[in-house]
């Protein structure tokens, strides 16, 4: 079956934004204008098509990246049909893992900003992730009809806070309740959308007299930015500022956007049906197709570098980037095809796990509606049914031409809670539900506490775990009670301990056991665990050295202070002895474990706690309360700045996670509900001794 849309006309984009910038409404409008959805779903009444999980509708925040396909021929119908695959990304900080995961498979992104709030803390996180994956982007300043809307302030913030070069290709006509449309700086025409048709129809008009001068000024800046795309253009521009044609300007802006040098900037009000249509045109004009992006790099099974170009003729390769459980078809694996073609029924190799699997059905998704398709080609994003082994980040490829595309990296969870099923019947279902949810979300972990037998769930924040427990109830019918959130402490050492021995000797008639290891233990800040074999002259036979390492690795799970995992230590195996008959792997495993425990006791063990980057936005009159409260939580204030437009103050602080439980409630009461905050994990830091003692004592009481 030939390709319906040439790959040059594909756009795989993400729509990213800070919570409440109106991203879901923007996506809804895209679906409406592209003719996929006929009635506009409003977030205000919880009916948005993209937000298809129940909790999202209640909380009004977007959690899962639903992948949607739409078609667009330009707002004036002047483009050949383009296929736009949209990955909806969440804007809440507890879900940055979702954003990171979708950034990995995008070719371009549209950053949505609130015209009043502008660049907010979460916008910075998303921007950093887009930089990490080198994703070209355009910016859409939404909610231009709000009181306090200021397009140019957001343009400055992108430069100051994000270090991005924002180039307006439109400027707004009016603001707040007087917002009417935009001036297209390329065409130098005003665009006014028609309210009757919900913005489907529009007219080009002359630029209002009061804006002519400003429009010329901003057009000049835009043309100058375009001219820097090449020597020839720059020369042409310098000879005559008005000599660049519309097509030349667009092509040059496109080139610089794809090279991540500039960010074209647009504006509108999705809620009032203004501007989204022009943003779709900008997606086609300025964001890359899969063919504009460099070939994807990976490794073959022998670890040699390999690459795949975005072509149907190359061997099939794809990356699984999301797993979801669907009540009707079971497990759905969302994947992005980088090269080649695959049909339902084909056998694929999961190169990451080295397992072959048969591809069942292939579904194309529109939010949570689906259409079954026969095949997918380079550049497509689709969902597969029937892949049992695949998890997020796995490479799916042609069994004859294996390749492993780069692995995604996922953060370690910082918060844990015990969960108990309410009834015996819930017990079995809970295990199944948690495993299924952990498969979908790599930043969520499940384990059993060996001492208490409790099931412990861990994640990226309180909201993250709240939603997991919520989903367990709704999707799997499991009622569970949840313990108090626990901090994921770690243990490490402060000094060096040398010549520490562990000797395991057992004589009990017949064959005994003998293992003897001498180690040096030292701090290894920020580098995790390292084991160095420094045995000379065969005092410990080669075959037993991995056993010593294994014994130590097992002991790392539970430190000597309070049984928390040990991090950032370096162990040198320096000496030891063995017995011809009695030595075996188990004895050396025990010796390694004993030596490590003793060395850790001697090397001044300390407790580490997760520190969070906290940002609070508060009206000025509550500054004193907010600062006092943060200090009482052992917080260190690192800076304050005015929120643009007289919107109060932004306080940046570093606060231990242990002190942040229930913070939203106390912030509400300290500021009459007028302040907001975001928090994300920063790093681990040593815990003050009085806090350490309390944590260690509590752990011992718990054990006793």
From Swiss-Prot:
tr-type G domain boundaries: 8-291
Gene3D superfamilies: 3.30.230.10, 3.30.70.240, Elongation Factor G (Translational Gtpase), domain 3, P-loop containing nucleotide triphosphate hydrolases, Translation factors
Any one of the GO BP annotations: ribosome disassembly
InterPro entries, alphabetized: EFG_II (IPR041095), EFG_III (IPR009022), EFG_III/V (IPR035647), EFG_IV (IPR047872), EFG_V (IPR035649), EFG_V-like (IPR000640), EFTu-like_2 (IPR004161), G_TR_CS (IPR031157)
PROSITE patterns per record: G_TR_1, G_TR_2
Signal sequence segment: none
GO molecular-function terms, A-Z: GTP binding; GTPase activity; guanosine tetraphosphate binding; translation elongation factor activity
Residues binding GTP: 17-24, 88-92, 142-145
CDD domains noted in UniProt: EF-G, EFG_III, EFG_mtEFG1_IV, EFG_mtEFG_C, EFG_mtEFG_II
Keywords linked to the UniProt accession: Cytoplasm, Elongation factor, GTP-binding, Nucleotide-binding, Protein biosynthesis
Subcellular location: Cytoplasm
Top-level taxon in the UniProt lineage: Bacteria
Pfam families linked to this entry: EFG_C (PF00679), EFG_III (PF14492), EFG_IV (PF03764), GTP_EFTU (PF00009), GTP_EFTU_D2 (PF03144)
UniProt xrefs under SMART domains: EFG_C, EFG_IV
GO CC aspect terms: cytoplasm
Main function: Catalyzes the GTP-dependent ribosomal translocation step during translation elongation. During this step, the ribosome changes from the pre-translocational (PRE) to the post-translocational (POST) state as the newly formed A-site-bound peptidyl-tRNA and P-site-bound deacylated tRNA move to the P and E sites, respectively. Catalyzes the coordinated movement of the two tRNA molecules, the mRNA and conformational changes in the ribosome.
Family: Belongs to the TRAFAC class translation factor GTPase superfamily. Classic translation factor GTPase family. EF-G/EF-2 subfamily.
Xref: PANTHER family: RIBOSOME-RELEASING FACTOR 2, MITOCHONDRIAL (PTHR43261:SF1), TRANSLATION ELONGATION FACTOR G-RELATED (PTHR43261)
NCBIfam families: EF-G, PRK12740.1-5, small_GTP
UniProt protein name: Elongation factor G 1
Organism, as annotated: Burkholderia thailandensis (strain ATCC 700388 / DSM 13276 / CCUG 48851 / CIP 106301 / E264)
């Amino acid at each position: 079956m030939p390709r319906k849309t040439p790959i040059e006309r594909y756009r795989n984009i993400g729509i990213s934004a800070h919570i409440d910038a109106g991203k879901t409404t923007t996506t809804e409008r895209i679906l409406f204008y592209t003719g996929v959805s006929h009635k506009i779903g409003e977030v205000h009444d919880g009916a948005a098509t993209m937000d298809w999980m129940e909790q999202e509708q209640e909380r009004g925040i977007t959690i899962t990246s639903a992948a949607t396909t739409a078609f667009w021929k330009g707002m004036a119908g002047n483009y050949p049909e383009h296929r736009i695959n949209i990955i909806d990304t969440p804007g809440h900080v507890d879900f940055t893992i979702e954003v990171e995961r979708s950034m990995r498979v995008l070719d371009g992104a549209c950053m949505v900003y609130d015209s009043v709030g502008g660049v907010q803390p979460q916008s910075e996180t998303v921007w950093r992730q887009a930089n990490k994956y080198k994703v070209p982007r355009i910016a859409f300043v939404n909610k231009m009809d709000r009181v306090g809307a200021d397009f140019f302030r957001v343009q400055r913030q992108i430069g100051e806070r994000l270090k991005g070069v924002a180039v307006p290709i439109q400027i707004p006509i009016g603001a707040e309740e007087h917002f009417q449309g935009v001036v297209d700086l390329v065409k130098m025409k005003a665009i006014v959308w028609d309210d009757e048709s919900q913005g489907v129809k529009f007219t080009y008009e002359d630029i209002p007299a009061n804006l002519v001068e400003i429009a010329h000024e901003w057009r000049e800046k835009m043309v100058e930015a375009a001219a820097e795309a090449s020597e020839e253009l720059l020369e042409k521009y310098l000879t005559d500022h008005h000599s660049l044609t519309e097509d030349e300007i667009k092509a040059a802006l496109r080139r610089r956007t794809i090279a991540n040098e500039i960010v074209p900037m647009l504006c509108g009000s999705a809620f009032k049906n203004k501007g989204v249509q022009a943003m779709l045109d900008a997606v086609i004009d300025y964001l890359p197709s899969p063919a504009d992006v460099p070939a994807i790099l990976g490794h073959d099974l022998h670890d040699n570098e390999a690459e795949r170009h975005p072509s149907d003729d190359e061997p099939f390769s794809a990356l699984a980037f999301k797993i979801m459980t669907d009540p009707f078809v079971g497990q759905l694996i969302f994947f992005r095809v980088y090269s080649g073609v695959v049909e339902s029924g084909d056998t694929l190799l999961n190169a990451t796990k080295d397992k072959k699997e048969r591809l069942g059905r292939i579904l194309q998704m529109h939010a949570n509606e689906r259409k079954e398709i026969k095949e997918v080609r380079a550049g497509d994003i689709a969902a597969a049914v029937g892949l049992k082994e695949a998890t997020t980040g796995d490479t799916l490829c042609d069994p004859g031409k294996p390749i492993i595309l780069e692995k995604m990296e996922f953060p370690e969870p910082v918060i844990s809670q015990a969960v108990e099923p309410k009834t015996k019947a819930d017990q079995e279902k809970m295990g199944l539900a948690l495993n299924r949810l952990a498969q979908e979300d790599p930043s969520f972990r499940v384990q059993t506490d060996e001492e208490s037998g409790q099931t412990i769930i861990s994640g990226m924040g309180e909201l993250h775990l709240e939603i997991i427990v919520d989903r367990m109830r709704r999707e799997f019918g499991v009622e569970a009670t949840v313990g108090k959130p626990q901090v994921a402490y770690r243990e490490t050492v402060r000094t060096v301990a040398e010549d520490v021995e562990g000797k395991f000797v057992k004589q009990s008639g017949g064959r005994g056991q003998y293992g003897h290891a001498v180690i040096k233990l030292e701090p290894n800040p920020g580098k995790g665990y390292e084991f160095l074999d420094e045995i000379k002259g065969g005092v410990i036979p080669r075959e037993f050295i991995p056993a010593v390492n294994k014994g130590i690795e097992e002991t790392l799970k539970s430190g000597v202070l309070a049984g928390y995992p040990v991090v950032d230590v370096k162990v040198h195996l320096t000496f030891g002895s063995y017995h011809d008959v009695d030595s075996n792997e188990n004895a050396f495993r025990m010796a390694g474990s004993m030596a490590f425990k003793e060395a850790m006791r001697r090397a001044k063990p300390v407790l580490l706690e997760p520190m969070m980057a906290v940002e609070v936005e508060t009206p000025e009159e509550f500054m004193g309360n907010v600062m006092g409260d943060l200090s009482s939580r052992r917080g260190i204030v690192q800076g304050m700045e005015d929120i643009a437009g007289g919107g109060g103050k932004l306080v940046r602080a570093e606060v231990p996670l242990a002190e942040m439980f229930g913070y939203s409630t106390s912030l509400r009461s300290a500021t009459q509900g007028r302040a907001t905050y975001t928090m994300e994990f920063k790093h681990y830091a040593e815990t003050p001794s009085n806090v350490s003692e309390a944590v260690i004592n509590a752990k011992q009481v718990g054990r006793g």
